[in-house]
UniProtKB/Swiss-Prot annotation:
PANTHER family per the UniProt record, alphabetical: PREFOLDIN SUBUNIT 1, PREFOLDIN SUBUNIT 1-RELATED
UniProt-recorded name of the protein: Prefoldin subunit beta
Species, as recorded: Pyrococcus horikoshii (strain ATCC 700860 / DSM 12428 / JCM 9974 / NBRC 100139 / OT-3)
InterPro entries found in the cross-reference section: PFD_beta-like, PfdB, Prefoldin
Residues that span the membrane, as ranges: none
The organism's taxonomic lineage, starting at the top: Archaea, Methanobacteriati, Methanobacteriota, Thermococci, Thermococcales
GO cellular component, one term: prefoldin complex
């Protein structure tokens, strides 16, 4: 790092920050995707039950009884919320990837030896 110009060192620091942000976004995306898959499976399962089926849900540390209609409505809302969150994370990941690519190109250009013209 001693022979690297200060401006390139600063860009390398920024690149490291972007890569850390990207890792966090990817982890969040994986969690949201897992939650979304779980909610969709639960909805599929509940929709196969008769309308008068006894359904229970967890609320904190409690398990409470609910109706099929209410459970379906809550799951659909949860799925919608998770899909919005997933789309936002996808956009965030894309923006960070673009910044990483752009900064990598700048670093490579700055480190490239000047060509004789």
């Amino acid at each position: 790092m001693q022979n690297i110009p200060p401006q390139v060192q600063a860009m390398l620091g920024q690149l490291d920050t972007y890569q850390q942000q990207l890792q966090l976004v990817i982890q969040q995306k994986q969690k949201v995707q897992a939650d979304l898959n779980e909610a969709k499976k639960a909805l599929e399962e509940i929709e196969t039950l008769p309308d008068d089926a006894q359904i229970y849900k967890t609320v904190g540390t409690l398990i409470v009884k609910t109706t099929k209609e209410k459970a379906v409505q809550e799951l659909k809302e949860k799925i919608e919320t998770l899909e919005v969150r997933l789309n936002a994370l996808n956009r965030q990941e894309q923006k960070i990837n673009e910044k990483v690519k752009e900064l990598t190109q700048k670093i490579q250009a700055a480190l490239r030896p000047p060509t004789a013209g």
